[in-house]
């Protein structure tokens, strides 16, 4: 029986620097309101960033975004949240 490897996680190259930062915060478990406060932006702007991240990476939800962030090494377990 042949085992096919899973395709690699989507490249993060499609994301802007700001979107990458938002993805980092999503992976750390922050809500839209918390991300907005941390980045000093409107909550609606955060929602827009989240939507763009999901669309660019062809993800269904935030949970998948968290998985991608860890699988690509964008965040690592136990790392500081700063």
What residue spans do the PLM features occupy?
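Regulatory hinge/linker segments at domain boundaries
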Residues: 3-25, 76-82
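ABC ATPase NBD switch/coupling site
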Residues: 9-12, 28, 56, 72
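Positively charged, aromatic-enriched patches within helix-turn-helix-type DNA-binding elements
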Residues: 13, 24, 37-41, 59, ...
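Hydrophobic residues on short alpha-helical segments
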Residues: 23-27, 54, 66
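Short amphipathic helical patch at the helix-1/turn junction of helix-turn-helix
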Residues: 25-27, 44, 70
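Recognition helix of helix-turn-helix DNA-binding domains
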Residues: 31-64
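Basic, Lys/Arg-enriched C-terminal extension of HTH/homeodomain DNA-binding domains
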Residues: 55-82
